Amino acid sequence: MRLLDLPLLLVLFLTACGGSGAAKPATVDIASFKYKPATVTVNAGAKVTWVNRDTAGHTATFKSGLDTDRLEKGDRKALTFERPGRYRYVCAFHAFMSGEVVVE
């Protein structure tokens, strides 16, 4: 291999390894009075969407004030998480339901 080929190979390698830079979204299904998955991990700037597949109304309510509001069966709501941290949430109607969003 010629020495001049090394920089080209390095550029190709780094391009192949690099991501798009966009934060990948996550989805949380609500079914059988549970958040599935109970914990999601996303990068800062990502959207998390809650989809209610249950017969009862539910929320994803955070202490910080973020809230999906009441979601009836088939409803969905996305929230965007800008700052790294761990964000626990509960259903305002069913306190035994809880989940967590981990933002890296």
Language-model segment annotations:
Residues L6, L10-E104:
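Extracytoplasmic copper-binding redox domains, predominantly the cupredoxin/blue-copper superfamily
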